[in-house]
Amino acid sequence: MPVLAKAALQQALEQRSGWTVVDGQISKTYGLATFPFAIEFVRRIADAAEEVNHHPDIDIRYNKVTIALSTHDEKGITEKDFGLADTIDRIFAAAQ
């Protein structure tokens, strides 16, 4: 899966709320009600990531979970990252 060109990357970001590029990865921070909710959210992300064999970087700070995605094999951002980003957004929406 090829790395997205700058224009395609910008277009993909514009179609998604809250995702930005940070240090060569797409990133988003989610706010959960409590620490246990944050941990459950991460558990669900882990299940989804395992299903597609694509694993995000995850940072947990109390009730805030930051996700960062890039395709390591391609050394950049690909459609695979946006596919998992969309899945994570759906997991978050279902948890609300």
Curated annotation (Swiss-Prot):
Entry-linked Gene3D superfamilies: Transcriptional coactivator/pterin dehydratase
Gene Ontology molecular function: any one: 4-alpha-hydroxytetrahydrobiopterin dehydratase activity
Enzyme Commission code(s) on record: 4.2.1.96
Lyase is among the record's keywords: yes
Top EC class of this enzyme: lyase
Regions annotated as coiled coil: none
Keywords: Lyase
Example GO biological process: tetrahydrobiopterin biosynthetic process
SUPFAM superfamilies referenced in this protein's UniProt entry, alphabetically: PCD-like (SSF55248)
Reaction it catalyzes: (4aS,6R)-4a-hydroxy-L-erythro-5,6,7,8-tetrahydrobiopterin = (6R)-L-erythro-6,7-dihydrobiopterin + H2O
Protein family membership: Belongs to the pterin-4-alpha-carbinolamine dehydratase family.
Protein name: Putative pterin-4-alpha-carbinolamine dehydratase
Organism: Herpetosiphon aurantiacus (strain ATCC 23779 / DSM 785 / 114-95)
